[in-house]
């Protein structure tokens, strides 16, 4: 790596540590030419597929949009941030595992609903009401009944355990 201070072409790593809970590596580097030290971060670049919207438009997958949607649905609900972050990672992992270059936005919505069902039933119904465009109280009742039928007796998946 080039030195950002003198542009010397070869710096050396003096120290490496895991950062971001193992999601990246923090490296301290030193330039043998000018003696300056600086920090770099290294993380895997994992491309997510392009999202195909219902109207046919295509846009890049946006992790922040996913995080915002979950956070909005969970607003004022007793769910730890670590669990929301775990849900975002789980959704991204499931999308990557499909191995497709494009995915429908509908699939992301369904994955979000699945995660919310495990995180908080109130947030799930809140999100479902917007996502599925509930028109009346009966739609809420039907969704709640469907949710109760699908309840998992052992407490759900890893999202219920926290990180």
Curated annotation (Swiss-Prot):
GO-annotated molecular function: ATP binding; DNA binding; zinc ion binding
Residues covered by the ATP-cone domain: 49-139
InterPro entries in alphabetical order: ATP-cone_dom, NrdR-like_N, RNR_NrdR-like
One of the protein's GO biological processes: negative regulation of DNA-templated transcription
Keywords: ATP-binding, DNA-binding, Metal-binding, Nucleotide-binding, Repressor, Transcription, Transcription regulation, Zinc, Zinc-finger
Residue spans, zinc finger unnamed: 3-34
Key word Lyase present: no
Keyword Transcription: yes
Cofactor: record remark: Binds 1 zinc ion.
Cofactor: Zn(2+)
Functional note: Negatively regulates transcription of bacterial ribonucleotide reductase nrd genes and operons by binding to NrdR-boxes.
Family label: Belongs to the NrdR family.
Family matches, as NCBIfam families: transcriptional regulator NrdR (TIGR00244)
Protein name in the entry: Transcriptional repressor NrdR
Organism: Acidithiobacillus ferrooxidans (strain ATCC 23270 / DSM 14882 / CIP 104768 / NCIMB 8455)
């Amino acid at each position: 790596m080039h030195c950002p201070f003198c542009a010397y072409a070869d710096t050396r790593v003096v120290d490496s540590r895991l950062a971001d809970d193992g999601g990246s590596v923090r490296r301290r580097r030193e330039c043998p030419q000018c003696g300056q030290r600086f920090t770099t971060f290294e993380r895997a670049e994992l491309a997510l597929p392009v999202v195909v919207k219902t109207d046919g438009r295509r846009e890049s997958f946006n992790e922040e949009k996913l995080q915002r949607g979950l956070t909005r649905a969970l607003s004022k609900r007793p769910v730890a941030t670590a669990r929301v972050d775990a849900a975002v990672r789980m959704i991204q992992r499931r999308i990557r595992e499909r191995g497709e270059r494009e995915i429908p936005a509908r699939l992301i919505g369904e994955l979000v609903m699945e995660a919310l069902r495990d995180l908080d039933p109130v947030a799930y119904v809140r999100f479902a009401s917007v996502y599925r465009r509930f028109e009346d109280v009966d739609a809420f009742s039907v969704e709640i009944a469907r949710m109760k039928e699908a309840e998992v007796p052992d407490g759900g998946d890893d999202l219920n355990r926290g990180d």
